[in-house]
Amino acid sequence: MLGPILGDIVGSPFEFDHNNYKHKDFPLLSEKSHFTDDTVMTVAVAVIFLARTGRSKPEIKQYVEQTFGYDLNRTCDEIRPTYHHVETCQETVPEAIIAFLESVSFEDALRNAVSLGGDSDTLACITGGIAEAFYGMPQELRDETLKRLPED
């Protein structure tokens, strides 16, 4: 998963229209190169991959902590009292993973995520992706989800 992360770091100085540089002659890494929310979302994709390929929760937790340096030793009960709406992935993805790690089912994972407060839809979206890969999604909830999407 380092390829996408390095791509994010290399592309970061050129993000947004006013920074675009449409040539190939640029330093691959500079002082302006840094990871962005794209790297953090890549972590979420990595966790979904691990869940989909049959890794256990302890294996997923260990991989994320060792590879990405996230502290996943907090509990939902510890997060809830002080957590608030944060628009950075760095303060959303770990909490979403913790909501999954503490869950016992797909629905429980979503309830954990929303119960943290903060950016509830983003938390539940990330947690839902991981939980679906790990537990599967009940058909009734799948049907309800599809009903709420536009046909086009």
Regions found by a protein language model. Give the residues of each.
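Structured, active/binding-site neighborhoods that engage oxygen-rich ligands
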Residues: 1-152
